[in-house]
């Protein structure tokens, strides 16, 4: 099923745990994901999040999107120990578009459910502060999925755009009242996060980049699988997933 998660903290190796980003991950029912990590402001002069004006690219720690491949956990079969994990669930995330690289890289981690809708993730990936692959621990908090006003069902969808010759790849995903997007046009990177407002419709939480994802692409809230549309900037998008549930 679809889910929304925000990061509570990350811990690298023996360093203390901390969090210097506003990180939100949308994962759709079909296991497409969009992961956007925005540096928190370090001075009163820097805009906070949500921001009504676009932020500089320097505020983007990481923005990537692709598909997740989870393997379920294996629990003990011994009587009285059925809740003990013998082998944790494991997820591999394949990056189809990434602000850091044009390669389809992967990262992976072991997941351990915790109380209060939290999950601990253990794995290894590149530390942005050192440039080296290091072991990490991340604490994720699952957010409750909400409905857009007037909709009777929960909804998720995914739009993609690609132009190999122009170096274009982009993903827009909606889960409930959140939409996130990552767009690469050559060397230009754009990311966006929007949230539904009952009075004003889809409103920006954060937008970064020269080639901003046009909000007009998702002016309609429902898409049909295979549906094609052209944005105001000429990019051609196609719906690769559309799902609703009660």
What are these regions (language model features)?
Residues 1-63, 73-246:
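Lipid interaction determinants
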């Amino acid at each position: 099923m679809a889910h929304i998660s925000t990061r509570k903290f990350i811990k690298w190796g023996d360093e203390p745990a901390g969090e210097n980003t506003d990180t939100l991950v949308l994962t759709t029912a079909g296991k497409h994901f969009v992961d956007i990590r925005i540096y928190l402001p370090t001075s009163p002069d820097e805009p906070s999040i949500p921001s009504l004006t676009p932020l500089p690219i320097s505020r983007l720690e990481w923005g990537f999107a692709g598909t997740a491949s989870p393997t379920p956990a294996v629990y003990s079969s011994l009587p009285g120990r059925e809740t003990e994990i013998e082998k944790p669930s494991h997820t591999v995330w394949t990056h189809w578009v990434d602000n850091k690289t044009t390669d389809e890289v992967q990262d992976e981690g072991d997941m351990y459910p915790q109380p209060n809708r939290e999950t601990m993730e253990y794995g290894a990936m590149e530390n942005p502060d050192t440039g080296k692959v290091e072991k990490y621990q991340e604490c994720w908090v699952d957010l409750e999925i909400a409905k857009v006003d007037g909709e009777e069902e929960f909804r998720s969808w995914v739009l993609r755009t690609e132009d190999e010759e122009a170096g274009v790849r982009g993903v827009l995903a909606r889960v409930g009242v959140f939409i996130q997007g990552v767009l690469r046009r050559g060397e230009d990177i754009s990311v966006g996060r929007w949230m539904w407002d009952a009075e004003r419709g889809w409103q920006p939480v954060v937008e970064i980049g020269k080639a901003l994802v046009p909000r007009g692409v998702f002016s309609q809230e429902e898409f049909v699988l295979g549906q094609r549309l052209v944005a105001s900037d000429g990019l051609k998008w196609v719906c690769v997933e559309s799902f609703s549930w009660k």
